[in-house]
Amino acid sequence: MKAQTKSKKVNKAWLHDHVNDTYVKLAQKEGYRARAAYKLKEIDEQLGLIKPGHVVVDLGSSPGAWSQYVRRRLSPDGAAVGQLNGVIIALDILPMEPIEGVTFLQGDFREEEVLAGLQEAVQARPVDVVVSDMAPNLSGVESVDAVRIAHLIELAVDFAVHHLKPEGALVVKLFHGSGYSQLVQLFKDTFRVVKPMKPKASRDKSSETFLVGMGLKRQG
């Protein structure tokens, strides 16, 4: 009974914070599906990653807030329905409501067949930016979760190495904790410029952070 009472208090506190969250209100006002859009928006505004004409791949895209933001960046009319100057390919294991101009593939990025489908959708076009909001189902066991998180990020890095333009960029979500320093080193080994970032829209209580890699190093 005590555990249930504590759980109810936690859920009530989370709901209160969520309803009163500045970015939740802003997302509703500006038509974004989730407050996460403002994390990518801040990163992009600081670094100038996404530009009209770009080919962008969005990994872990559902519910679609990041793809919505990218679409607005690639459209002369912003959020309005109409012309799109660029290509957006989104992928998630979960379903995603359609977004005009976004090619969506549903599947598990860890499976070779799904990865092959993504590569086919890219059609050998050099990719300008890969953004990844992928996260595994967390078990609560840090050592287990660290391995799952690292695996997804390693797959994203491998995809970027094979598909990014030499001057392209990769943005990934990760969490401070076990394995963090190794993932930062992986980025440093792969990219010429590496920037850890904690956008304002990322909750203070969360260990969530983002790594941005820009400009591929020569491999081999």
UniProtKB/Swiss-Prot annotation:
Provide any one GO MF term from the record.
rRNA (uridine-2'-O-)-methyltransferase activity
Q: Where in the cell is it found?
A: Cytoplasm
Cellular component, GO annotation? cytoplasm
InterPro entries recorded for this chain?
A: RNA_methyltr_RlmE (IPR050082), RNA_MeTrfase_FtsJ_dom (IPR002877), rRNA-MeTfrase_E (IPR015507), SAM-dependent_MTases_sf (IPR029063)
Tell me which residues bind S-adenosyl-L-methionine.
64, 66, 92, 108, 133
EC no.? 2.1.1.166
Keyword list (alphabetical) reads: Cytoplasm, Methyltransferase, rRNA processing, S-adenosyl-L-methionine, Transferase
Which EC class, in a word?
transferase
Q: Which reaction does it catalyse?
A: uridine(2552) in 23S rRNA + S-adenosyl-L-methionine = 2'-O-methyluridine(2552) in 23S rRNA + S-adenosyl-L-homocysteine + H(+)
Membrane-spanning residues: none
Q: Cite the Pfam families for this sequence.
A: FtsJ
Active site as annotated: 173
Q: Does the keyword Amino-acid biosynthesis apply?
A: no
Q: Does the keyword Zinc apply?
A: no
* Family from the record: Belongs to the class I-like SAM-binding methyltransferase superfamily. RNA methyltransferase RlmE family.
Q: What does this protein do?
A: Specifically methylates the uridine in position 2552 of 23S rRNA at the 2'-O position of the ribose in the fully assembled 50S ribosomal subunit.
Quote the PANTHER family the UniProt record gives: RIBOSOMAL RNA METHYLTRANSFERASE, RRNA METHYLTRANSFERASE 2, MITOCHONDRIAL
Which protein, by its recorded name, is this?
Ribosomal RNA large subunit methyltransferase E
